[in-house]
Amino acid sequence: MKYIFVTGGVMSGLGKGITAASVGRILKNRGYRVTAVKIDPYLNIDAGTMNPAQHGEVFVLKDGGEVDLDLGNYERFLDIELTSSHNITTGKVYRTVIEKERRGDFLGETVQIIPHITDQIKTCIRQAAEETFPDGTKADVCLVEVGGTVGDIESMPFLEAVRQMRGELDEHDYVLVHVTLVPEDAMGDLKTKPTQHSVKALRELGLHADIIVCRSERVVGANTKRKISAFCDLPLSAVISAATARDTYEVPMEMEKEGIADVLSTHLGLEKKETDPSWYRLVTKEYTNRVTVAIVSKYGIEDVYISIKEALKHAGRALSTEVKIVWLDAERYEPCSLKDYDGILIPGGFGKRGIEGKIGAIRFARENKVPFLGLCLGFQLATIEFARHKCGIADATSEEFGEGSHVIALLPEQESVTELGGTMRLGDYTSDIRDKTLAMKLYGKSQIIERHRHRYEVNPHYIEKLEKEGLVFSATNKNRMECLELPGHPFFFATQFHPEFKSRPTRPSPPYLGFVEACRANKRTT
């Protein structure tokens, strides 16, 4: 197994995840099997209970793992499915070591950061790297992104584990890529001093960067590269410019042009294979149409809904249609403005804030024949809206929101749950699709597997009344409602699951593909 460790310096939010995913895509384009691990140096066990406004989207894996959004980037760029073991947190590591100590596994030793914590970190990395793909094969290369910034106290045990692994691995099985900021001053000059200090901090920990990826707003020129090469003691070819791209899927192509593949091949002893051009053709595909979609949401931060944004992009690219997204605050938007959009999307979420605005948008889409896609909470609110305005249940609501007729109720198995973390209905579940429905048209098969993250469901006591008034539940998991739709509407479709988590640039999610196609067919904007 060959390992590529990715660290970051100067500041957080530089794009280490996109850099790591892009490196993986470059190697995959050359025929190598690639997997990825994300290290998050926080004490949380996982990302499930973290505030999305601070941390961004909680991405859900097939096994129900609630993880950092970077794992979503890995899955999309590499077209793989990861598991919870591919996300290593300080909380997981410490919990495991403490459990071992309580069992007596250390035979009376004094348990310390070194060697016990670092040994557990190395074990977690190796176990994740060795997991097999569905076809029974294993990865040739494992990417390991170390979250945080070099110098942070939280990252120290992980960086020490990386240092130890360098000594334990063959010289051609290890490479360290350091992502750093090259800012522009008021005169427009690119400054290398932050990079120099970042590399110095890395060296103080016993680590040496084999490749430096320079993040900047514009291309880093030859003179700046030479300066970084000289001061950071590595070949000029190992200084890679990574300017901010218009589209993140273009980053692998830009890094390929910088020659990073050849540098990696030399360090890792990889055969230099021809590059598969299919990624280039996909990313450079031209748009011939454009639609505008309103996303009525609770949070005004795009990273909270990054998988939705990417799924719309995947569908648009497949249909040669550029999808422009307009974010509407569910509590503040003007209802009359909804007529200006080709489609309306209601994303998932939790809590009561903003739900009436979302319900109003759903009603507008239903009554005015505007293409609508609802996801998770959007599915539940579509049920509530229909119950209120078509079934005459004026106080229809969800048990999550308070008193009223609970057309949305708590899942029975949730009634005994006392902890928040990792206790929802999470991960892959199978749904059976009814024949002659929109769901069947979208998926083209009678059984599907999609990822879930919820505690509430359609109350079985109201299903008959809802269906009598025309609502169709077109997919179910046993007695649970998974999809709903409205016959006679151009596109009114909602899912209890999150189809965006399985969308890929090469394989768009069927509900998103159908939604964008309906937006294009019912275009209102210019």
From Swiss-Prot:
Give the binding site residues for ATP: 13-18, 70
- UniProt xrefs under Gene3D superfamilies: 3.40.50.880, P-loop containing nucleotide triphosphate hydrolases
Q: Example GO molecular function term?
A: ATP binding
The Glutamine amidotransferase type-1 domain covers: 293-525
Write out the pathway annotation from the protein's UniProt entry.
Answer: Pyrimidine metabolism; CTP biosynthesis via de novo pathway; CTP from UDP: step 2/2
Highest taxon above the source species: Archaea
Q: Where does UTP bind?
A: 12, 191-196, 227
Oligomeric form and interacting partners: Homotetramer.
- What is this protein identified as? CTP synthase
Give the gene that encodes this protein: pyrG
